[in-house]
């Protein structure tokens, strides 16, 4: 074997995943899979021929030295053991082949190369043979080998002996009574093997085999996926076979009359030559009728000469790489009878190569599969076609016959499968899960198992194909491969035996099929609710028969679980809104926790995009219709991808890039899809040229810049783009960054609040949800099934048309049978009924207000127009239909006309709200949704009337014709003549039959059938003749069930599934007359009509441009809202009855009326309803929150949360502000409300108190930074509220949970008041609390703070009588925070700064007390802000000896809490000058700079104090104790970090040079500073 090229990269692949078999996974017990060797030594694994695979522990490329001394000991010493017995030295160069070039095996190093099962202690007869070559032997006389003697005549050292030093007999599962004993023997066998191996490394982890359960019929077997790898080459090319392996014969006949071909053969254990070629001369052999290879116990590999027939290789029915199986034989080695597969590690370790039974020729799937991801597919296919020597074989016709490659051929290694020896868990299949959360949870578990228990990650599942059944491969004329089991008398008799056995099993299966239900269940057991269990129990005890309603109890399709799976809290989930560094740290932490030695690439790339089994290119293209382009990049795999001639192969895989930091990159009120479009902007020049075609584009703009998505996601392809193809990628990236920078936050007049950012993050999370659910309908379409040609798909469409055109086609028989036929794909079904562009709908998400900068860049004269054929750089002035487009009155762009589109070319900063249809403020679709022609970008027009019209216009423009026809100015589109199938179906629809069509939705739960029914419903609604008629009839007949089904059908194609609320038909039976009397029943019915019509209106506007039905639905919805307002106004007790129903014991009734009330609150079309609700809504919520039922309290909480949102937020604030005018302070009453009841041992706050607390704190944290707060916030920014809160805490005699939340509100209120400088000093000696009623609401003048109030708060903090109370520490900490905010004002601080009690009785004792961590931290922070905000006060502290007392606290006797906080704030004091200097450099333009001369003076005084008093010795003793810990005491890491930071500041900052010079005079101090300095980089800035 040639040596390796040192220039080749050894970076391991990061895209390998498990097999995609649907077979059942078996639990894999944990084994010690750590590689053997010295700790810290790189563990390399010899992987495949011609390349080198670095194991999981190697993160750098391994390069061999240029000059290697082959006579050195390092070269001759074996260190690694290859798969076939090849030994490698430390340079990974093969130096010896065990059993080939040595007359005898070396002691301690020669593994036995015979089959493990040949000498097994199993009572079952041996059924496997070794494929290992025999020893060197110059005598080629095959007569020496006896046919029925498997081991006796072989060279002794090649026999498998249990006494061998390295390997012992592999356990047989049939030799044990139970599985646990078998597991124990496997573990013991592995331990002995690893102990005997010593320093020699195995290339794989020691795998295992599993006994399979018995099955009774072939129909239950699932096809297993061969774990082929595009990146793999073979183990067996690691060495060349010697002459002893290949036996050349001259068609001589042995003693038994066997004939041999001229092809090279390998010897089997029974002495027979393993010639399996179809081109051999063995047709005279009567005992080998079907030309199978060595039936019975003879299994091996034939390596044919290039001119001598097929290259066949034995392959087991059991796929050991997946734990799945497919077999039909009943021989002793078949996995059906419970024995493990012989293709397991037993054959791998003992033989050095694979040994598979009951199989036929295996060939590399990469050469034949139709959906190959490999670009070398066509080249290999042509090679194989040239070298194909046998086409008569059925297996060859299927594309699996072996080529004529010899072992020396350049592509011979492609026939090997390196993954056969490793058991790999089955990957979860997406179709088996009802929700994405279930699938994600299963994928995480699977990935954890594979990573932690597999040394070399398995290949990508997209590279696998399904194997044909064995019954299809076996033939009677001898042309096929050997697929039979172990034969009778070594001949092909087992084929007949297997056939009769299968016939008996088929009869048994038919009898058992009616006795048991065969159900396909997910891998993870779904959640079963209590109602489902009760229903199943009733069903099992009933006498229900399978009649015409048997679809209700389908045994093939299970109902989805009623509860959605949720990931555990401990599982980290990838969020699109996370920053890159934070996301990377989380993934890195997960990898370290799962496997300490795994350092490969990211393995969870598929979490954002579930794998598609086949046809992924078409699926990604379909996704471009609803989603922004998911960042895809073509990965160039240079580590182990190479052809035999040395050429590189480039693969393209869809890999999601790391998520974008939207929070830092975007303004909170910037529109999401505009930004996503901007990311795809190539250059500014291409923008101007692309938008040139927008002058004449329809009503409001053209489509010259519409993009088209590609399957690989390489970028946005602008039509009309010119002049950008010659630029490099770096130039494009730079210009794109410049374009984004022009639209950055700095160019916008934006002051975002926390609430706005929170709302914007919610929008991004909603967008992420679209990514997760957008793949859920892929399996219904034709591109999900590989192997269909366009002609075959066209024939399927013609079949549907023939069924529709057949006589007697009606609704009950024809339509129902058509939608239930699973052979018809959904997309072909829709094409038959003229629904070519019917795709997923992206539901509306809340929009943020548009931001319009006042800067407009003159575009000047533009270049020639784009696709629209117009010229000029400006935008046309056609009348737009979207009211959200901002049109400045006097601004002009280009030709001086106001813009009609928010997308301004050539770097303008104008942004506005998203494109809309007919003024809907809450409805827009993502890029190129079913109506659009491509992705949304800044060059797309947004003012067309409907997406359907935009799609037609874009198609016309792309064809190069005019967007306007020559007659009447109407849009020129494709002919809209309905097809014959559409006319036939619409002829069946009338006012009576349409509700029957809707009932089909209740008769099936199959996703494909529901999709077809929904498509037909949409076809009816988009019809100009039928649409309005059917909806009008439903509303006239008050058929709410049909209206519900109609909303369900039209929302079926949502990108995110919609959970519709069902109208409770049995509500009359559940409610008492006191609730359901009067107008309640009619209002509830109208609310559901309003709700369903809203869903229909939003989606119908997307799928249809029929003005008649759109106008009717809109008017009907408004009419329902007006009638609700009239009923509400006439019945004054209606709101009382709704809340009475909310408090009922029944959860169903409470949830139903909660839904009704929420719809009424959000009903903006009826001002009457809004005004009536505002009267008593808050009072009823307050009463409902005291209910004893949890569902009623949930209703109160949900309603209160809605009141905190727009537009009800102002109403809630105004209600509390009104109570202040009445001197009631209702929100304070709500804050202090406690739970009632004698059973409560410890009083706790009520629900209304918790809700009010969250509301008040949220308002205080999100108040805009305006100079003067808005009047609406006066309900909380009020001096009366301030003193009431303060007195409620200071004068409290017993702390409760209510006091705790009041203290939190008080601390937040003080922060806001201090931020706006609303505190003022008062010389009054009276305590605050009594406020002039005439001025109590005038907060603009400030809240008067007297010294008496300050001393009351300080006295409260000094009081220790309530320290044992559980709430005391938190309450005191909040009050200390409030005191810090009060003392920030210089006037207020000057009134008490010279009071001795402030320091002697409060500050110094509190700094010394470390019992309460947060309290102590805030006390030291108070000391820090005294110096920072009040210049010159440090001199007073020094003169008054208070500073010396504070420094005395820092000693070895102080606790870690005190020392940590003291060091932290002292470090901040020393670095105060540098901090303020850096802050001045980064300040925003127009803001005042900080005068640093006062800080420099204070820091200088502090440094002089340290030098004069020799204070550094205190810190040196602490440092010495931490660094010279000889007592074994655990070191506080936070304290260690703070002391090193303190040292670093002294040695680094220029302001501390005086202290540094004084410190360096002491050798011990100098040593400590030098040691700390070595911890940091010299160039690192502080």
Curated annotation (Swiss-Prot):
Compartmental location: Cell membrane
**Taxonomically, which superkingdom?**
Eukaryota
Q: Name one GO biological process term.
A: aggregation involved in sorocarp development
Database matches in InterPro entries: ScaA
Keyword flag Methyltransferase: no
Which residue ranges does the record annotate as region GefA and gefH binding?
400-600
Locate the compositionally biased regions of type Polar residues: 249-267, 288-310, 318-332, 940-953
Q: Name one GO molecular function term.
A: protein kinase activator activity
Give the Low complexity compositional bias ranges: 1-14, 109-131, 715-726, 903-928, 960-972
The UniProt regions of compositional bias labelled Gly residues, in chain numbering, are: 478-493, 694-714, 864-875
What is the annotated quaternary arrangement, including any partners?
Component of the Sca1 complex composed of at least gefA, gefH, scaA, phr, and the protein phosphatase 2A subunits pppA and pho2B.
| Protein name per Swiss-Prot or TrEMBL | Sca1 complex scaffold protein scaA
Question: Origin organism of this chain?
Answer: Dictyostelium discoideum
Its taxonomic path starts at: Eukaryota, Amoebozoa, Evosea, Eumycetozoa, Dictyostelia
